[in-house]
């Protein structure tokens, strides 16, 4: 499957871990459809690890845990589809999944056929307990080939954590998205750590094969499977803006059945989502390079430029960007009309540059700039 914009959806792992069941999945599908998330673009509902029995059946096929999913996975898929959503599942390139359930190693084709028979639309494919002999590219090529021949269009999400220089070979596998890092946790330090690993990977991200910075922690507040210290709403807003601006898939990880208004506002901001889903799929570039106070720019398909200032430091800090910094010389006569994407305020038309103002620690400001001539 070729995906033209970063996939969006929800995944069970961050909050629920192995504590998943049919009732919770149905309730989550209901909320995705009724809250507005689906209509904002969150279309995939993905069940992560721990959904199967510990052993395959006598025919070598994976078996859903009947206590967790008493009606089977086809019934779950049917319910998810009835809500206008797409259904995702999980497996692993090793002989076991990360939680110790059967993996797909040397069962790639039979498992792909099984997923297709359940009407699965998305497969997250992890990298635990993988063969020490085979390079990751061979293991992911195997499942990619199996999915391409299973008789159903299934989005392939490769989760190899950036191991074995994933970025150099992942497009060979047919994957539409690929994890570039280890797992995220619900802390500000985890967000900063994952962002710091992205700069060298920008050339490998884009239309058809997106760099996955891991699921979102927005709205978790220290609860759930990867919940640790938690983050403030300001930090969650910056985390979301970073993932969106850098072109990562946007996979919600909180329990959306109990979202706060603040969480909803972050996850459903149409203007930030539009930056992530821009059809050009261009990568951002640094305008002002600073480890704690960077400013990035990104060119949109319609010619607009988005400027993003992320305060990753511990002090209020102002930044100023001149239009020359983004390639517009004063002699061109070009001005930029600037809109703040979070506040929705039009700030005015500027002919030489713009001052961001003092952004609070761990906060951000995202400005969309429209070219005005004459």
Language-model features, listed with the residues they occupy:
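Carbohydrate-binding surface patches
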Residues: 243-246, 251-253, 289-330
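Structural recognition of the beta-strand scaffold that forms the well-ordered cores
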Residues: 6-12, 41-47, 86-91, 121-126, ...
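Glycan-recognition surfaces
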Residues: 107, 138, 149, 155-255, ...
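Solvent-exposed beta-hairpin/edge-strand motifs
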Residues: 325-344
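Catalytic cores of secreted or luminal carbohydrate-active enzymes
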Residues: 238-288
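C-terminal beta-strand-rich structural cap/linker in extracellular carbohydrate-active enzymes
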Residues: 348-374
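Aromatic-lined carbohydrate-binding/catalytic grooves of carbohydrate-active enzymes
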Residues: 24, 28-132
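Active-site beta-loop-alpha junctions enriched in small/polar residues
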Residues: 13-15, 50, 92-96, 128-130, ...
């Amino acid at each position: 499957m070729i995906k033209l914009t970063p996939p969006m959806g929800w995944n069970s792992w961050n909050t629920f871990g192995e504590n998943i069941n049919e009732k919770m999945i149905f309730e989550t599908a209901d909320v995705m459809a009724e809250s507005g998330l689906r209509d904002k673009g969150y279309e995939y509902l993905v069940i992560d690890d721990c959904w199967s029995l510990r052993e395959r059946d006598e025919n070598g096929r994976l078996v859903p845990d009947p206590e967790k999913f008493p009606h089977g996975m086809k019934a779950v898929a049917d319910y998810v589809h009835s809500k206008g959503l797409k259904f995702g599942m999980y497996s692993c390139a090793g002989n076991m999944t990360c939680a110790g359930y059967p993996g797909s190693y040397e069962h790639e084709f039979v498992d792909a056929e099984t997923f297709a028979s359940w009407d699965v639309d998305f497969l997250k494919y992890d990298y635990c307990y993988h063969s020490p002999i085979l390079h990751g590219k061979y293991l992911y090529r195997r499942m990619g080939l199996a999915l391409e021949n299973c008789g159903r269009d299934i989005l392939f999400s490769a989760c190899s954590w950036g191991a074995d220089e994933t970025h150099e070979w992942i497009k060979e596998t047919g994957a539409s998205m690929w994890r570039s890092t280890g797992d995220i946790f619900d802390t500000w330090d985890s967000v900063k750590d994952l962002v710091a690993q992205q700069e060298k990977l920008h050339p490998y991200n884009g239309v058809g094969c997106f760099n996955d910075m891991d699921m979102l922690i927005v709205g978790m507040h220290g609860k759930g499977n990867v919940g640790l210290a938690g983050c403030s709403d300001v930090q969650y807003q910056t985390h979301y803006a970073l993932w969106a601006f850098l072109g990562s898939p946007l996979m919600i990880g909180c329990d959306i059945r109990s979202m706060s208004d603040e969480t909803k506002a972050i996850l459903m901001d149409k203007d930030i989502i539009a930056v992530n889903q821009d059809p050009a799929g261009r990568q951002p570039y640094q305008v002002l390079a600073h480890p704690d106070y960077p400013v990035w720019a990104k060119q949109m398909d319609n010619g607009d430029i988005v400027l993003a200032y992320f305060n990753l430091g511990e002090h209020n800090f102002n930044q100023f960007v001149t239009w020359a910094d983004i390639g517009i010389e004063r002699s061109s006569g070009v001005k930029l009309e600037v809109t703040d994407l979070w506040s929705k305020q039009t700030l005015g038309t500027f002919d030489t540059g713009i001052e961001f103002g003092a952004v609070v620690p761990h906060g951000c400001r995202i400005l969309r700039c429209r070219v005005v001539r004459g």
